[in-house]
Every structure is written in C-alpha cells, then in structure tokens.
Amino acid sequence: MSASSHHDLHSKLSLGGILVTLGIIYGDIGTSPLYVMKSIIGLHTIKPEVVLGGISAIFWTLTLQTTLKYVLITLSADNHGEGGIFALYALVKRTKVKWLIIPAIIGGSALLADGIITPPVSVASAVEGVRTYYPDINTVPIVIAILVVLFTIQQFGTKLVGKFFAPMMMIWFAMLAILGILQITQNTSVLCAVNPYYAYKLLSIHPDGFYVLGFVFLCTTGAEALYSDMGHCGRKNIRISWIFVKIALLLNYFGQGAYLIKHAGHTLKSINANNGNPFYLVMPEWFQPFGIVISTMAAVIASQALISGSFTLINEAMRLNFWPKVKIKYPTDLKGQIYIPSINWLLLAGCIGIVLHFEESSKMEAAYGLAIVLCMIMTTILLTYFMILKRISWFIIAPLILLYLVIEFSFLIANLDKFPHGGYVTLIIASALTFIMSIWYTAKKISKNYTKIVKIQTYKKVLAELSVDLSIPKYATHLVYMTNANRVDEIEEKVMYSILQKRPKRADLYWFIHINITNEPYKKEYKVTEIIKNDLFRIDFNLGFREPTKINLMFKEVIKDMVAKGEVDITSRYESLSKNNIIGDFKFVLSEKFLSNDSFMHWHEKLVMNTYFFFKKMSLSEEQAFGLDSSSVKVEKFPMVLHAPEKIELCRIK
C-alpha cells in the first residue's frame, strides 16, 4: 500500500471506521472515570462546592485540552495521515531547527513511561470493584495475572481479540452515559458545573488547593493517544466519534457528581467501607457485578492500546536513530501491527514492578500524570513550529500557544506535588528513556561526523580493472555493500578500503545500497544508478519511518525487476554455470565499528561513545536489522578514530 493510498483509506469517514476508532483510540481516556472523581475527593469530607468545582474543572479540561487542542488543532498536524510526537517531529524537521530534537526525545520518553503506569492504574481500578463483595481480598495477584496474560498474547497478534474491542467499548461508553443520566435526573443542579467559576473557586476551597489540578488532569491523560493512533483510524473518524465519547464521559462525570452532592457531609469510606469509588457507587446494586466485569474488560482494552502504541513508538524511534535496533515481528498481515519482544517484556516487568510497589490504584494515581503532561508540553512546542511551517499568522499562533503553555505548565506544577508520593517513579523511567535516546542519537551523530566520505570517480578505473583481474581469486559474483553516503557519486572510505586494500575483493558486479528514511510514514520507493557500466550499481531505497527495512527481500525484488527489463545479467560468470543459466552468488559485506585505542576524546564524547557501544552489544546486529541471510554475510570490523593523535616525534638511534 502506498503512502497516498494509506492516507486516502484513513481519511474516509465511515460507520465501520468510527466503530474501530472506539475500540482502538479511546481506551485510556475512556477509562478515566474509574479514578478521577475518586482522586479529587480522596479521604476528605464531601462538599457540594468541591464536587461542582471538580466537575467544572473536568468539563473545561476536556473542552480546552482534549477537544480544542488535540481533536481540532493537533489532529490537523498529520504526517501523511500519521500522528504522534515522532511523526510530528519528522514533519517539523524540515525547518532545520536543530534543538527540536530535544522536545521530540523528551516527549517520546514521557509517552513510553506513561505506557508503563497506565495499564496497572486502569486494571487495578477496575479489579478493586470486587472489594464490594470481598472486602479483604488482595487484588495484587489478580491485577498481575491479568497483565501477564495480556502481555503474553501480544506475540500472537491482536487481530482476533481486536474484533471485540469496538463492540466492547461501545457497551462501555453506553454504560457510562446511562449510569450518568440515571443520577443526573435525580439531581439536575449538578449541571450548573458548566460555569467555569466553580472550577476557579475549586482552587481556593479544595484541601489540596492548587495541587488538586494534578487529579483533574487525569481526565485528559489519554488525549495524546488520540493523536498517536491517528494513522490507524483517520482524523475524520476520530473527530466524529469524539462527540459521542465526550458526551458519554461528561454524563458519567456529572452523574458521579450528582450522587456525591446527595451524600454531602460524608466521606467515600463512610458511604461504602469496602469500595469507596464513586464510579461503582452510582451503579444499582444488582448491576455492580456486570459493571465490574465490563470495567475490567475496558481497562484491558485501554492497556492493549497503550502496548500497541509503545511498539509503534519504539519502531519510529529506531527509524529516526533514537533507539538501538531491536527485533521486530509481524504477527499478522494487518498493516502497522508489530510486536517487539524486548519492549513487550520490559513493559510487563515495569507494570508488575508498579503493581508490587504501589499495590492499590489510589497510590498509583500519585505516580500518574507527571510524565504525560511533559509529553503534552513537548507536543505544544513542536506544534508551534508546525504552524510556522504552514505559514499561519502569528496573531493566531501566539495566543493559542500561550494559552496551552499556561494550562499545561499549571498542570505540570500541580503534578509536581505528586513527586514524593510516587511521581518520581515515572519521572525516573522517563529520564532513563531520555538518556538512552539522547546517547544513541548523539553517538550516531558523532559517528557520522567522523566517517570519511570519498568520491567514487577516483576509484572507477581501479574497480573496473579489479573485476577482470584474473590474478586475484574471485570473492563473489555479486558483492554488496551498505552505504550511508547520501550522494550517488560518493562512498565511505572504509568501503573502498575493504574492496581494494584489506583483502582485494574481486567480483563481477559491485552493488552499493543506501537507505533513506523519509518523513512520509509508508513510502516505498527505489532508484537504480549505473555508476560503472556492467560493473557498479547503486540502489537508493526511500523508505517511510514506519516501514520495515527488509533489505534482503527488497533487494531481490529490485534485481528481479532489473533482470526482467534486461538491465543486468545475474547469471554466474563461470563458464560451466553460465551455460546452464545458474544464478551467481550474492555476498553482503557489513562493517562493524569499534572505538580505536588511538582515539583522543573529550570526557563527554567518551561517556557517549562508551555507553553507545555498551547498548550496541545488546541491540540487534546489522545483518538481523537489515533482514539478511547470515550465510551470505561477511562482517568486517573497522576502528573508529575520534580526534586522531598528533604526530609522535621519535628519535632513531644506531
């Protein structure tokens, strides 16, 4: 599927598309009623003005932050139909503003950290509903068991279970709306919470003061997922389905508020000592067992969306040189559905660690929100440059960006209050991920700066002579090198050293393959240049940042196409094999760098490069990353010299 057809497919508005959107996009933001009002009220006595203030703050947060910023503005910043912070960075990279790499890396790391905390919070909040019937039950083993099953089935793909996501989430949102309406009809005064005055007043009357915004923010943590998963569903489908989702969410929040106002003067524990969660309290007693099951399934779906999103994020990070190469599997034929084993088990370990550390959802909520608000701020910064790129007037850009920086920094300051209570956990995770991405990107940049590029023109004559020099044993019929040289008439000096000096490698045909990762997510193009007639070819692959680099398969397709067009003869040049039309052998030569002992580095370069090579040992080898058959690959080691030593003065004695 081409990039344009992929974009056209997802830009279409359809009932099926809307249903799929419900199943994929809204799991995170859709399950927030499980814990938001519970967090705002906490252990304090229920006061009508606090309840109205909380509902009002939720209403305006969902309106300004989720609806206006993400659904209306940010979704317009699509990269050929794809969304997410890395897709946005790939889009604004063309502004040539180098420091934009910083918000991209911080935002991506924060989003990954959120993928570790969200599944435990959602699943734990849902499972704790069983305490209504079994007050002394330890929910930790149940939560861990659900998470283990969820992460284990990832390797088989989610095509089958994904069919149930849409109808299940439809039931979930319908349940939210109906439960809310039942309570609102009994206390319509709660509707006055649409007045923003109550939200403003909340900051002065809530026991936690300004920091209550940290709990209010939990209602919009899933907004970033709307943007990240745009490529799966399309902008129009998200915008239309959001109308239904927002109404269902608000009805439930207002319904919880109506119930709480009726119980003013009490605490949540005094209303129900076993399960003081207003989400479950609004349910009729006979419906609660069904509500617990539906909530748990919705929480699992929310977790699934974040796991899939994390795989996509890491895949993009690898293409943009932010992350070490790791093994990627394609469990189904669905486009864009990938499985990364190492990330899957790391996420599971992180989720289990969170559950064991905090044990209860109320304690996990303290760790929740800090990372994602950082991601939102980074998105706002990148969005500013997208608007500049689109030549939008500064009279529009300035007030919009200022508004969202004020809102998001307010949420950030409020969330910082959670730091000693658990917020440090996600911040440590996000910092570790930022460190890895920064090291990998910087090391790649240093490596590129110290790679010597030479003109192929200088070597044309000797290459042509080498291929027919019978005094040198033939190394391969076809000799293939990967190159990072962007220009067709250039090549790395180490490649020519490998062919001519290390051990002269005679071949009938030489091939240079260059991969260019494009800003378009699903581009698959190639260009063939004949540098020396019947001796040297260069193939340039232009691949989207979401496309897998299956070089072995793609190279075969290119060769097949060239043979069909009579552009190249790949039969063996050995007489006995040639007359029987036997295809010649192909040999790939890959270079593996190591840090030379002759390198003189500054301390920061030493830290970066040593850490880079440490991570590289644990990452995928070049042959695996390119999808090459190891039997046809030769790996050569080349020393990487940074700041070559000055000439050493030696005195010869007799």
From Swiss-Prot:
Catalyzed reaction equations: K(+)(in) + H(+)(in) = K(+)(out) + H(+)(out)
Endpoints of the signal sequence: none
Topology in membrane: Multi-pass membrane protein
One Pfam family matching this protein: K_trans_C
Keyword line: Cell inner membrane, Cell membrane, Ion transport, Membrane, Potassium, Potassium transport, Symport, Transmembrane, Transmembrane helix, Transport
Domain of life: Bacteria
Family named by the database record: Belongs to the HAK/KUP transporter (TC 2.A.72) family.
Name under which the protein is recorded: Probable potassium transport system protein Kup
Species lineage: Bacteria, Pseudomonadati, Bacteroidota, Flavobacteriia, Flavobacteriales
Gene symbol of the encoding locus: kup
